[in-house]
Amino acid sequence: MITDVQLAIFSNVLGVFLFLLVVAYHYINANTGKPSAKAK
């Protein structure tokens, strides 16, 4: 059975991974914008 400590570590690692995934998505999305969109 999974313990409270293992569950806490798993949820923290999952949370950090998802946060970094969102940050990476926004970074990539902001730096690969269309040139025509920047001209407006």
From Swiss-Prot:
Cellular location(s): Endoplasmic reticulum membrane
Gene Ontology CC entries for this record: oligosaccharyltransferase complex
Intervals, Lumenal compartment: 1-4
Domain of life: Eukaryota
Membrane-spanning ranges: 5-25
Its membrane topology: Single-pass type III membrane protein
Cytoplasmic side: 26-40
GO BP annotation list: protein N-linked glycosylation; protein N-linked glycosylation via asparagine
Keywords: Endoplasmic reticulum, Membrane, Signal-anchor, Transmembrane, Transmembrane helix
Quaternary structure note: Component of the oligosaccharyltransferase (OST) complex.
Function: Subunit of the oligosaccharyl transferase (OST) complex that catalyzes the initial transfer of a defined glycan (Glc(3)Man(9)GlcNAc(2) in eukaryotes) from the lipid carrier dolichol-pyrophosphate to an asparagine residue within an Asn-X-Ser/Thr consensus motif in nascent polypeptide chains, the first step in protein N-glycosylation. N-glycosylation occurs cotranslationally and the complex associates with the Sec61 complex at the channel-forming translocon complex that mediates protein translocation across the endoplasmic reticulum (ER). All subunits are required for a maximal enzyme activity.
Protein family according to the UniProt entry: Belongs to the OST4 family.
UniProt protein name: Dolichyl-diphosphooligosaccharide--protein glycosyltransferase subunit 4
Species of origin: Drosophila erecta
